[in-house]
Amino acid sequence: MTLDELQKQIVGLHEEVPLLDGSKRVYVNFDNAASTPTLIPVQEKVDQFCRWYSNVHRGTGFKSQLSSWVFEEARTIIARFVNADDTSSVIFCKNTTEAINKLAARFHCPAAGDEKPVILTSVMEHHSNELPWRKVGELVHIGLASDGTIDAHDFERKLIQYRGKVQLVAISGASNVTGYINPVHEYARRVHEIGAQIVVDAAQLAPHRPIDVKKNDDPEHLDYCAFSAHKMYAPYGIGVLVTAKNIFEVGAPEYVGGGTVDVVSLENAYWKDLPEREEAGTPDIVGVVALAKVIKLIEEVGFDSIIHHEAKLTAYALRKLSAMPDIVLYGDTDPGSADQRLGVISFNVKGVDHALVAAILSYEGGIGVRNGCFCAHPYVHHILGVSPEGVRTIEKHILERDRSRLPGTVRISFGMYNTKEEIDRLCDMLGTIIRKEYKGIYTMDSERGEYCPQGYSMDFSSVFTL
């Protein structure tokens, strides 16, 4: 299958959505950094499997044995997708957030009075690669360069400053705010030279670039890696932790119960080997099937085609947006380097609240974007130049349930199926907003931080019911 063919296989690609004026228009989805739609071949594979679905492991019935075989075949496909060797294990989780929390739980907190290990991370991180590590040790942040990239010199300084104390470096494969791609293998080499390990949050990277954790004896090996299927055109509730086995082979599992034990008596419990010991209860077998199918589709199309298409879209969007004087872009704005980043672009419209821009695009343009801080508050505060005092004020307002004055940006993010025509449509709507020619009168719900047009409400039940 070619990319051109796969682009036509997006579920819901031609669905129309209602607009404020009573008309309908084909939906434009520029929110792929949050989640992607599924693909028709993935949907069909799930439907096909559901005829044979049964619970996995230890069942003697044909459907149970088939489901168990499919489950483990999928694990092999996923391991191959990231080039993991037999010193690593693929553990299924709900999503990237759970995967990183599961890993963090294995890095035990020191006893009272003992020196805490240092966890190095960056200001760029998604909260899911920041908050779990706060429980583990002393979290030290690598600074950012003026363009919002990770400061390589500060990274080196921190490695030297905390040499002998750094236990782990937690870094994102790519930013969900600016689309920057981090040189994780270069980082891995340096991290291993000082005797530490590295975990890569690859949630944003996985749909757009190949992931290579490399063999265990490679200096650039990624010790741990996590990603989610819902950002890879398989939103069926599965995530993956690719992990070195040894850290999970001692002690009790994080969650205990069915499927985690070899034998239980009233006095003892003896845990299974990986990965079963860390997959308590009935797993999301359907989600695993969906992820395996989309991986095979991506491999068939090839990442080169995906990268080329998304880079063209990103360059085109940057040129169009840069030509609009009232648009403020954040991060790298050079169309010539579009192939060195992801198609994630954050911007604001001068003099217009980011939440209002997003609302007008939705209600009057049928265009789905995301606005705010994208679960990366410190990073967005940094690129917006919010002072420490400003951050304290933001915290105060939120604790008072007032989200009407929060800083943020508008984010567009491309998938392999988006088009230049959709970007043109976005820019036309932005022009309407800049000229203040939009039709609705919008009011802010201060508790939610969202704008809605007066006298209008969505009748969702006319489109879908349970």
Walk through the language-model features, giving the residues of each.
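Pyridoxal 5′-phosphate
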Residues: 1-466
